C-alpha cells in the first residue's frame, strides 16, 4: 500500500495493493493495524454506498457538524469520479483550500478525509458506485453543506463538466455558501 500526503495535512491518498491473475483480482480495502501505521487511527462504525446513474452527477459539498462529525475513507468501486475535500475549519491555515483525486474501479485508490472537511464528488462516467467508511453514525440534525460552486473555495468542477450542467439534488442546487452555512468546525492546531 502506498500513502500520499496532499497539500492539506491529514488528507491522504491511498493506493491499495491489487493482486490479479486470470480469474480477476483481490485487494484488501481496509485493515485496522495497517491503516493505523499510516496514521489513520479513527474507528470506523458505518459503511455507506451511493449509486449515481448519470455522468455529470455532482454530490456535495457536505459534512456533519460536531458531535456527529465524520472522517471518511472513500473509494469508487464502479465507474470513475473526481473526489474533493475542502478544509472548512475556521482559523485553519488551509481554510477554504481544496484537494481532489480521481477515484475509479481501475485504480482502486482511496481518499481519506478527516473531520472538519466538506466532501463531494463528480461522476465522470454513468453507473457509478461509491463507497464510504465513516467514523460516526448519520445524524440528520448535524447535516451541513455548501454550494458546490462556492466562490470562496472555487473547486474546479467546471473544466471537468466540459460545459454541461451538473446533475444536482434539490438540496445541492439551493445550498448556502460556506460563509452562510451552519459550519461549526474550528481549527485546533496540529
Segments from the language model and where they lie:
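Short beta-strand His + acidic residue motifs that chelate non-heme Fe in jelly-roll/DSBH
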Residues: 111, 119-124
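Non-catalytic, conserved peripheral segments adjacent to functional cores
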Residues: 1-106, 125-127, 134-190
Amino acid at each position: 500500500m502506498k500513502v500520499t500526503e496532499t497539500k492539506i495535512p491529514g488528507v491522504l491518498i491511498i493506493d491499495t495493493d491489487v493482486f490479479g491473475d486470470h480469474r480477476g483480482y483481490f485487494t484488501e480495502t481496509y485493515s485496522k493495524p495497517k491503516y493505523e501505521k499510516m496514521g489513520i487511527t479513527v474507528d470506523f462504525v458505518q459503511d455507506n454506498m451511493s449509486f449515481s446513474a448519470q455522468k455529470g452527477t455532482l454530490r456535495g459539498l457536505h459534512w456533519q457538524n460536531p458531535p456527529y462529525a465524520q472522517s471518511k475513507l472513500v473509494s469508487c468501486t464502479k465507474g470513475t469520479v473526481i473526489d474533493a475535500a475542502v478544509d472548512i475549519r475556521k482559523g485553519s491555515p488551509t481554510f477554504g483550500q481544496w484537494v481532489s483525486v480521481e477515484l475509479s474501479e481501475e485504480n482502486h485508490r482511496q481518499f481519506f478525509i478527516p473531520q472538519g472537511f466538506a466532501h463531494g464528488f463528480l461522476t465522470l462516467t454513468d453507473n457509478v458506485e461509491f463507497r464510504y467508511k465513516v467514523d460516526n453514525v448519520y445524524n440528520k440534525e448535524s447535516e451541513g453543506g455548501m454550494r458546490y460552486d462556492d466562490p470562496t473555495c472555487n473547486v474546479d468542477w467546471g473544466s471537468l463538466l466540459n460545459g454541461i450542467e451538473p446533475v444536482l439534488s434539490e438540496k445541492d442546487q439551493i445550498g448556502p455558501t460556506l460563509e452562510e452555512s451552519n459550519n461549526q468546525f474550528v481549527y485546533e492546531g496540529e
